[in-house]
Amino acid sequence: MWTVESECGRLRAVLIQESIRGFWEGKLPFTGIESSTHYLARCPHADIDGGKEQWGQLPQFLEEEGVKVFEVASILEKALEDATTGERRQIVERVWEGIPQAPPAEELTLGHLLSGYPERPYYDPRSDRVVLPDFQRVGWPYPRDTSFTTQVGTVICNMRRYSRRFEPRVVRLCYELDPTLRERTEVVYDASRLDLGSTEPPCVEGGDTQIVDEETIAIGVGQRSTHTGFMEATRRLFEADTDGKIRYICAVRLPDYPALDYMHLDVVINYPDRGRALVMPYFFESELVPDMPPRRLLLKTLEAVRAQAERDDRPMEPVVHPNDFAGAGSCAVYVRGGDAPRLLRRCPSLIDFLVEEGKLEKDGLIYVGGRPERENDVEHLMLALMEQARGASNIVTLRPGLVVAYERNHATNDELRENGVRVKEWEDSYLDMLGGPHCSTSPLWREPA
């Protein structure tokens, strides 16, 4: 069985998702922020041809390093070509479970799976109404979020974002229909099919989940993954771990809405090499790394932004409050218990936990935007915030000391190189500010660091 044993060991197999048309041109306006084209306004000049050309560099980078690449749409297209009517009927039942109308099995197409049923909106003159696709199931090129593989098997995620709620159903089909994935992977927990009847949804997402090493998993809890989702996933993973591989599973606190650029753990920390981490400065606190840029400067900057907004009589609702970052980066460490995971201890910082456990070197931190030149360097803070928003921290490691990173984050990429990390620069003028190389890859098989 394929497993993932680290974030920076040699990457052997990966799942990617080519959904460029759905990303930019398949979203309907007027249906709320999660489907509105206005949500993409931070990258207003995106065009499908340029974006597709740039996205195509990703599988090239992976294959150059010998990584076996599986792509969602290609898997589904091949499966439909070979499927009998009975097999198509099973697919329809799985994907459209609980949905009133579904395509006839004999008419099922790839477009139905990705874009919804019907495939395209149309005007029906008989009823004098516009008919819309029921749900766009694959509209984002970020398979990291919908499933993740651990030391003990694969988890299908439960998405908190409404626009992605049915995407895991389609992604799970890939694990079942591709012959290699069916043989080499094992789904040990499908969170998308879970209903605990609780007031908080049991959401857990792959962008929040990091396999730090052979015995440690970190899961961010905040805008996407919930505490309920974390606890249930932790329980299921310990249950699946019959050989006792997993020692620690850490819940890492993340800012809540409206701090949208901090929605997942993988936008504030990643691992380019053994004992090293690329981190967003001003986010984590540390008692063990005294020269870490302090969060206090970020909070003071947020205070200034809010004061300026109030002075100018601008709406305050979407402006991040300093309290949104209270406790950010702290972690609760869980170990195997009797009937449920047991809280071992709380740490003021994930960084300090990793240093204490020998999983991260004290001098192994590499900062987004490089190091500040002076104390309370607000210009450096602004640079780090801008590069982080463009996905600077969202690198994916192909093997120890070799990463794929977005090209436009010059300061961060230079800092990686100065610390001995080789960088494959991914052209990103059409791609960044919504997700990066880490989001765009879901490791299926990765060696220990």
Question: In which residue ranges do the predicted regions lie?
Answer:
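The feature marks the mature, well-folded catalytic cores of soluble enzymes
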Residues: 1-449
